[in-house]
Amino acid sequence: MTTRVIALDLDGTLLTPKKTLLPSSIEALARAREAGYQLIIVTGRHHVAIHPFYQALALDTPAICCNGTYLYDYHAKTVLEADPMPVIKALQLIEMLNEHHIHGLMYVDDAMVYEHPTGHVIRTSNWAQTLPPEQRPTFTQVASLAETAQQVNAVWKFALTHDDLPQLQHFGKHVEHELGLECEWSWHDQVDIARGGNSKGKRLTKWVEAQGWSMENVVAFGDNFNDISMLEAAGTGVAMGNADDAVKARANIVIGDNTTDSIAQFIYSHLI
């Protein structure tokens, strides 16, 4: 029997703007599982910031985190495979951040750390406070990102935001050119920086093929630039209606936005 897979981005796709799951999506995905589909979350988030959604969907598959940087097993509470950022690259990036006066949120081991409480940090921290303590991601303010980068086991990625968007775009290109790191936009005002070569599509393909399955039988849902790699790698790439036109152009199908029952409708109409 052919095993079919549904790969799901979270923010801007499966989640509403209020960071909640639509009841219709939960129900449709449960029906898809009953019909034999494997569900997997493929996100730019740290694994500590996925708990409520993973549990609500009652998943048993690993999660692809930080734009494909690592594969995390929630039940064993362990990283299965990873390509973290080399420490020397992290230190060079931190030096560049300081030179350009850009604040970064650094994703490490089991936490997200920062020096200054920027808009992105405050926004995500406020969301975290709405969760039960056992589901709350760990945010830690540190005196030095550089010192922390040398003390942890792994640096997964950096998330950067800045009031001056053109400056942030220029900085991202500068980092790619100078350090050979991967820069992907995960939100309209946020660029994620990770080890060169990491992507959602690459990690998803590796996981699917390791199970002996085919990417032709994968349906991937996404909305942003960091989703393009998996939308193109999947047999069917589905872009949300709220996606940028450049993302929609790389998908096979475009559905409604993330405030509607479009994911559920697609599942019922095309998959089960």
UniProtKB/Swiss-Prot annotation:
Q: Where is the active site?
A: 9 (nucleophile)
CDD domains per UniProt: HAD_Pase
Q: Which InterPro entries match?
A: Cof, HAD-like_sf, HAD-SF_hydro_IIB, HAD_sf
Per the UniProt entry, what are the Gene Ontology biological process annotations, in alphabetical order?
pyridoxal phosphate catabolic process
Provide the alphabetized UniProt keywords: Hydrolase, Magnesium, Metal-binding
Task: Name the cofactor(s).
Answer: Mg(2+); Mn(2+); Co(2+); Zn(2+)
User: Could you say which EC number(s) this protein's record lists?
Assistant: 3.1.3.74
Catalytic class of the enzyme:
hydrolase
pH-dependence of activity, as noted:
Optimum pH is between 6 and 7.5.
Reactions performed catalytically: pyridoxal 5'-phosphate + H2O = pyridoxal + phosphate
**Annotated binding of Mg(2+), by residue:** 9, 11, 223
Reading the lineage from the top rank, the first entry is: Bacteria
Query: Which sites bind phosphate?
Result: 10, 43-44, 200, 226
What Pfam families does its record include? Hydrolase_3
Q: Look up the record and report any one GO term of the cellular component aspect.
A: cytosol
List the molecular function annotations (GO) for this entry.
Answer: magnesium ion binding; phosphatase activity; phosphotransferase activity, alcohol group as acceptor; pyridoxal phosphatase activity; sugar-phosphatase activity
Q: How is the cofactor bound?
A: Magnesium. Can also use other divalent metal cations as manganese, cobalt or zinc.
User: According to its UniProt entry, what is the function of this protein?
Assistant: Catalyzes the dephosphorylation of pyridoxal-phosphate (PLP). Can also hydrolyze erythrose-4-phosphate (Ery4P) and fructose-1,6-bis-phosphate (Fru1,6bisP).
| Similarity comment text for this entry | Belongs to the HAD-like hydrolase superfamily. CbbY/CbbZ/Gph/YieH family.
What name does UniProt use for this protein? Pyridoxal phosphate phosphatase YbhA
Q: Name the gene for this chain.
A: ybhA
